[in-house]
Amino acid sequence: MTAPIQSKMATRVAIITGVVFVIAGLPKFIGFGWEVANFTRFGLPVPEAWVIAAGVIEIGGGALLIARRWVRFSCLVLALTMAVAIVVSGLGRGDIIPSLTLAPALLIACVYLGTNPPMQR
């Protein structure tokens, strides 16, 4: 792929991935009690702290991807978050949706963006 095409593709992937992360992070605060119940079911200690951390990471990281700022750092943190989601809730508890569908797709998008970051605005 040529550089301009690659950059346009990376820009689109960054924006779309960022929007998905922001949307995924909002329920951590809007439906806090429901999310805490899920995180409790996953066997995580201090589930309230995990819910808040996940929400901040998803919304903050998603916003940085949309703005195309600190893309590699954001993708590293977001990829680690998705890896935890896959292992803890997907493989650990058998939650197919979203932990074994959306989380792996977002992990792949983060790896792509981490190795092919879009140009900053």
Regions found by a protein language model. Give the residues of each.
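Membrane-interface interhelical connector segments
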Residues: 32-45
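Extended, low-polarity transmembrane helix blocks
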Residues: 1-30, 50-56, 60-121
